[in-house]
């Protein structure tokens, strides 16, 4: 991959806070939810009744996508978006991985030449300036949004805006962006298809830089300049499947069939629950015991119907009524709910067990403290192994644009579940002498 060296120094015409407010107001108009709805339309079988929602998924489409995933990555991405909104299990899985990185678990290390010593004032200024920028970035919120999209779609493209008002990452439509290289720090760069803005020129005009310069360059030659490099200081790109820069495939696409099956079972259970509370109550008009008489009612039918109508008006929606001269019992439409619940529970466990991680979401299968600690360490490593180094690389590159002599940011390999354990270990290790402390620091990732 070619290294990206270009840098644009243009200042955005809007503050980060203004752009954030504008995006939040207009998100529905520029978001990808319409594409998720389109994926739903493709998965619904139009030949079947829409009242039977548990039978509307056309898995043939999914099988077609899975035969050649690289060629169907846009369809798979749209399907992933739909399942994210449709399946609570899938949403939990995405959020579980996205929240594994604790952006507050970091060390800020001033750069000091041990041989020459350091200028105390410069070191303190570097440390303070770096902390000031980090404190103003609201990393926990902005990066969480990026991580969610990355785990759902494999790649996140964004434009970062930073000034005294704060820091905001504007998501970029992945259908109009693609990874094209990497910086020397290790994080990814991308190019953007500027033809997208022929339908969103108001967005270019309102946001200003870097879009203004990029769109002007595109207009000068719409063929050769269609793909524009996102300027360095604005470029944010995270990718879960870091082993393949070119094809963005949802990390959990192999679970899509199981997730659709689980959604089917949940819909079936909803129908069963409704049927289980449904009852049919009968009002029988008593007959005379005269064996020779026919239709000899002891109550006048007109009077019976008058009271029957009053009775029907007082019934809730899930209870029906009938008036008949034939004796009938109360009819119920129960089902084996326990079996249905077990089916859903087992299907949910199957999704978690085959996800490759997220063992804690199926904690009933974990027995004992040792097993729990092992499971969380595995889940943590799985969720952070690609995104944590990219986060650290991006932060250090971004700081180089904002601080003249930035300190180095080291992201710690921990999660909300293991932070307390790490603090205890660091306190214990701090009591050792300098030689041992240096070795321990190396093991902890410091140098």
Residue positions per predicted region:
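Extended, non-catalytic structural segments that build the interaction scaffolds
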Residues: 20-24, 38-46, 59-87, 287-299, ...
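Short amphipathic alpha-helical segments
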Residues: 122, 126, 135-147, 299-307, ...
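A generic structural-conservation signal
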Residues: 143, 361, 438-439
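Intrinsically disordered, low-structural-confidence terminal and linker regions
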Residues: 1-62
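Short, charge-rich, low-complexity alpha-helical interaction segments
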Residues: 307, 393-400
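Extended, charged amphipathic alpha-helical segments
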Residues: 5-8, 12-15, 222-368, 402-425
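Long, highly charged low-complexity segments enriched in Glu/Asp and Lys/Arg with interspersed Ser/Thr
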Residues: 404, 436-447
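Structured, mid-chain assembly/scaffold modules that mediate subunit interfaces
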Residues: 71, 77-247
């Amino acid at each position: 991959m070619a290294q990206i060296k270009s840098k644009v120094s243009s200042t955005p015409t809007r503050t980060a806070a203004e752009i954030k407010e504008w995006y939040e107001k207009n998100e529905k108009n520029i978001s990808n939810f319409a594409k998720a709805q389109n994926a739903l339309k493709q998965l619904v079988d139009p030949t079947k009744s829409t009242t039977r929602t548990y039978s509307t998924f056309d898995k043939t489409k999914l099988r077609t996508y899975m035969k050649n995933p690289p060629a169907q990555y846009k369809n798979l991405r749209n399907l992933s978006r739909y399942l994210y909104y449709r399946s609570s299990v899938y949403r939990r899985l995405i959020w579980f991985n996205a929240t594994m990185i604790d952006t507050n678990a970091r060390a800020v290390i001033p750069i000091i030449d041990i041989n020459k010593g350091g200028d105390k004032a410069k070191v303190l200024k570097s440390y303070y300036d770096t902390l000031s920028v980090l404190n103003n970035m609201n990393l926990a919120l902005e990066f969480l949004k990026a991580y969610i999209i990355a785990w759902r779609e494999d790649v996140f493209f964004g434009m970062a805006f930073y000034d005294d008002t704060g820091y905001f990452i504007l998501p970029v439509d992945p259908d109009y962006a693609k990874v094209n290289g990497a910086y020397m720090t290790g994080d990814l760069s991308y190019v953007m298809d500027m033809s997208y803005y022929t339908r969103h020129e108001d967005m270019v005009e309102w946001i200003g830089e870097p879009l203004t310069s990029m769109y002007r360059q595109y207009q000068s030659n719409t063929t050769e300049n269609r793909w524009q490099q996102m300027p360095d200081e604005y470029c944010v790109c995270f990718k879960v499947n870091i082993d393949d820069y070119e094809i963005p495939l949802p990390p959990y696409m192999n679970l899509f069939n199981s997730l659709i099956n689980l959604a089917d079972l949940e819909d079936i259970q909803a129908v069963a629950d409704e049927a289980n509370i449904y009852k049919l109550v009968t009002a029988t008009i008593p007959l005379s015991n005269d064996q020779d008489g026919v239709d000899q009612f002891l109550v006048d039918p007109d009077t019976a119907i008058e009271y029957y109508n009053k009775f029907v008006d007082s019934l809730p929606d899930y209870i029906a009524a009938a008036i008949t001269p034939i004796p009938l019992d109360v009819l119920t439409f129960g089902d084996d709910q326990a079996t249905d619940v077990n089916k859903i529970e087992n299907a949910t466990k199957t999704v978690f067990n085959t996800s490759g991680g997220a063992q804690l979401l199926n904690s009933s299968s974990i027995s004992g403290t040792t097993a729990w600690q092992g499971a969380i360490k595995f889940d943590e490593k799985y969720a952070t192994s690609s995104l944590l180094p990219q986060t650290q690389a991006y932060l250090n590159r971004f700081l180089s644009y904002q601080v003249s002599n930035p300190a180095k940011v080291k992201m710690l390999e921990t999660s909300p579940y293991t932070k307390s354990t790490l603090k205890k270990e660091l306190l214990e290790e701090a009591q050792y002498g300098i030689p041992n402390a240096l070795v321990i620091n190396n093991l902890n990732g410091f140098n």
